[in-house]
């Protein structure tokens, strides 16, 4: 993953960033599946819009607190 997002009181999220038309490589698919199989939160975000939406989700969690 490109980023690991850690917020207080929430599980870590492994984030893969792609362009709008970007695709996961076969190795990325394998690694993300391994993380999911271990019960980890995994997100693949395509383009700036999805990144902004994800950041808004994070901000909401921080505002709501634990």
Please provide the spans of the model-predicted regions:
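Catalytic phosphate/metal-binding cores of nucleic-acid and nucleotide-processing enzymes, i.e., regions
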Residues: 1-66
